[in-house]
């Protein structure tokens, strides 16, 4: 994979511009490839880089890496740190974690408070982590135009020219009679009207009218300005965020801060602030954009074969047309499909008409109610130290293949309800078991009894592979007590 740090831009960096990457979503409409603990932004959908890596590369053209803020949750933070490890030093203090999702307004308010404290003139460039954008220069120009308006205390959003009567996006109508600013072909206008996701008839009318734009979900504003507007239109949220800031500044326990955040009422920045503000402005932009909101969205950005099919992975097809076939690992064979979606992963397969791709969220909701593990994570789960793959599980046992990269070290931990048996397949493992520390070579094994502190690390130059067999009445990943951890995860006080 090409080094992300090599990406450069001729755009002059604004010393007061702080990109804020919103990376707390679950991407349910992209299941089964996207899972709650490994969502869409962590996937390689187009090219060699994941969506969040592409987003990071894009925004550092306008601002120094140490001014990029990441808004996410504890469950995803470690995976994001791994994917953005080239900037681990610059980003080390720039993760703002939501203990629980409360929609976009609380998350943005929390980051805005932090940035206003760091820099009274801070301008936020708020971007989702999982969008695809083509046209770096056009994006840079739009950011520069929006930042000019933000300095006048406007709350700026980017408008996307519709290419079809889409019912999955909100729409924005600018007041073209008033031009707030102009740079080249770009113009900024006050927002005349926000429209929630319309039905098909209304969407067709907006497309025909030609003066409505898709709401991109990207924003530029001064941190102080958005805090003022939140205070004006969402006073309860403003008071709650101020209270959380005070708790954090006074050294309150994490539990107290988390409880205060969970008490906030969920509210969207669009409906809660932008649609009510008199300072809302729009800059219609010229870059190619897709939020990859469903499998059907791949039609917009992915290359197609002569029959209009999007084919990814090991796929053999006979006579299909305008279909999307995604093979994660296994061979996928299709015959005579028309306008269909087929997505195969090691533990789940999706088959649906393209016209119903938005309904995948309903499937995920059913899986959540059933407490099915397939909505939560893949069989292979990535960690900062490497990964593990579930090979088999049943009542009272689970078998994993654990991979530890050179220099990787798991936390010092114990489990209350399971024991473990480790067999080294390749490499040499440094094992901590209770008071013992010893090396375990290829072909050798050891037992980790219940309630015993233990740790696994790889001091060698090659990747360490072990087979782990767990036994016990409960084998969930939450049965863990950490005492030491190299990656900043929760440890027992």
What do the PLM-derived regions correspond to, one by one?
Residues 2-16, 223-423, 428-446, 454, ...:
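Left-handed beta-helix
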Residues 2-21, 28-39, 44-128, 132-140, ...:
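Conserved N-terminal catalytic core of the sugar/cofactor nucleotidyltransferase
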Residues 22, 127, 424, 469:
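Catalytic metal- and UDP-sugar-binding loop of GT-A-like glycosyltransferases, i.e.
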Residues 52, 111, 130, 172, ...:
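Residue-level signal for inorganic ion chemistry
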Residues 135-263, 281:
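Conserved core of the sugar-phosphate nucleotidyltransferase
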Residues 354, 451-452, 459, 471-472:
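Short, surface-exposed secondary-structure boundary micro-motifs
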Residues 457, 471, 484-489:
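Intrinsically disordered, low-complexity, mixed-charge
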Residues 466:
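Noncatalytic nucleic-acid binding interfaces
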């Amino acid at each position: 994979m090409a080094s992300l740090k090599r990406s450069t831009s001729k755009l002059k960096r604004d010393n007061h511009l702080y990109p804020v990457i919103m990376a707390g979503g679950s991407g349910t409409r992209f299941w089964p490839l996207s899972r709650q603990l490994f969502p869409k932004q962590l996937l390689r959908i187009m090219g060699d880089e994941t969506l969040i890596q592409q987003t990071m590369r894009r925004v550092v053209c306008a601002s120094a890496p140490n001014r990029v803020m990441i808004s996410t949750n504890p469950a995803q933070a470690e995976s994001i740190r791994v994917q953005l490890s080239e900037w681990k030093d610059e980003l080390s203090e720039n993760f703002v974690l939501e203990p629980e999702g409360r929609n976009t307004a609380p998350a943005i308010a929390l980051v805005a408070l932090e940035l206003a404290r760091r820099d009274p003139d801070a301008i936020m460039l708020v971007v989702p982590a999982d969008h695809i954008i083509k046209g770096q220069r056009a994006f840079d120009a739009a950011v520069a135009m929006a930042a000019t308006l933000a300095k006048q205390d406007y709350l700026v959003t980017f408008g996307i020219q519709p290419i079809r009567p889409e019912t999955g996006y909100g729409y924005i109508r600018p007041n073209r009679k008033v031009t707030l600013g102009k740079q080249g072909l770009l113009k900024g206008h006050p927002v005349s009207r926000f429209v929630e996701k319309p039905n098909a008839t209304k969407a067709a009318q907006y497309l025909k009218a030609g003066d409505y734009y898709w709401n991109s979900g990207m924003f530029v504003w001064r941190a102080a300005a958005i805090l003022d507007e939140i205070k004006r239109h969402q006073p309860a949220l403003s008071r709650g965020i101020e209270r959380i800031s005070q708790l954090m500044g006074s050294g309150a326990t994490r539990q107290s801060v988390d409880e205060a955040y969970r008490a906030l009422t969920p509210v969207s920045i669009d409906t809660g602030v932008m649609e009510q503000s008199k300072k809302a402005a729009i800059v219609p932009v010229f870059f190619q954009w897709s939020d990859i909101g469903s499998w059907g969205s791949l039609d917009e950005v992915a290359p197609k074969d002569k029959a209009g099919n999007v084919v990814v992975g090991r796929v053999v097809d006979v006579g299909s047309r305008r279909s999307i076939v995604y093979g994660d690992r296994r061979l996928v064979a299709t015959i005579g499909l028309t306008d269909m979606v087929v997505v195969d992963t090691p533990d789940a397969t999706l088959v649906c008409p393209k016209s119903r791709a938005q309904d995948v969220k309903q499937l995920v909701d059913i899986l959540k109610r059933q407490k099915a593990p397939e909505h939560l994570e893949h069989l292979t789960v990535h960690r900062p130290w490497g990964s593990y793959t579930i090979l088999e599980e049943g009542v009272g046992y689970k078998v994993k293949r654990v991979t530890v990269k050179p220099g990787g070290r798991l936390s010092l931990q114990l489990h209350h309800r399971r024991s473990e048996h480790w067999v080294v397949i390749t490499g040499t493992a440094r094992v901590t078991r209770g008071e013992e520390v010893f090396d375990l070579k290829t072909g050798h094994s050891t037992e980790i009894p219940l309630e015993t502190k233990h740790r696994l690390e790889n001091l060698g130059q090659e990747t360490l592979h072990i087979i782990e067999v767990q036994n016990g009445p409960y084998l969930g990943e939450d049965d863990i007590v950490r005492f030491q951890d190299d990656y900043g995860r929760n440890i027992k006080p």
